[in-house]
Design a protein with these regions (language model features):
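Short aromatic-glycine-(Arg/Gly/Cys) micro-motifs in beta-strand/loop hairpins
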Residues: 6, 61-83
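Conserved beta-strand segments of the P-loop GTPase G domain that flank and frequently precede/overlap
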Residues: 12-14, 39-44, 73-74
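STAS-typified acidic loop motif
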Residues: 1-28
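Short, solvent-exposed loop/turn segments at secondary-structure boundaries
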Residues: 51-53, 84-87
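Short acidic-hydrophobic, aromatic-tinged amphipathic segments that line or gate anion-handling sites
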Residues: 88-96
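Short, glycine-/small-residue-enriched flexible loop/hinge segments at domain edges that mediate gating
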Residues: 23-54
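A charged, well-structured terminal subsegment
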Residues: 97-101
Length: 101
């Protein structure tokens, strides 16, 4: 996992294709280090991402909405028409940054 802080947001990049483990490792960071930060999850390297994988982030996305913070996932492998409206997914990092700013 690679974390890059910017002025208005933090980008967390997943380094492996084990999304269950990534979410498991991410959750403690969300409670402390990344608390109160707008968050971009960079999953561009995951070319086999499925809707099932995306739903691993549902609880995190919901918590960010309650906290009035942005939570955006970046992945271009998913079909935009099959995505739940509750989770924001964009195909590029630039679009994710634009959504937060």
């Amino acid at each position: 996992m690679k974390i890059n802080a910017h002025d208005n947001f933090v980008v967390v990049k997943e380094n492996s294709n084990d999304l269950e483990n990534f979410v498991f490792l991410l959750k403690p960071l969300l409670s402390f280090q990344l608390k109160d930060k707008n968050l971009i999850i960079d999953l561009l390297d995951n070319k086999l991402m499925s809707l099932k994988d995306l739903l691993l982030f549902q609880n995190i996305s919901d918590a960010y909405k309650v906290a009035n913070k942005s939570f955006v996932i970046v992945n271009d492998a998913l079909n935009a028409n099959s995505l739940p409206e509750e989770i924001i997914v964009v195909p590029t990092l630039q679009e994710a940054e634009d959504m937060i700013e």
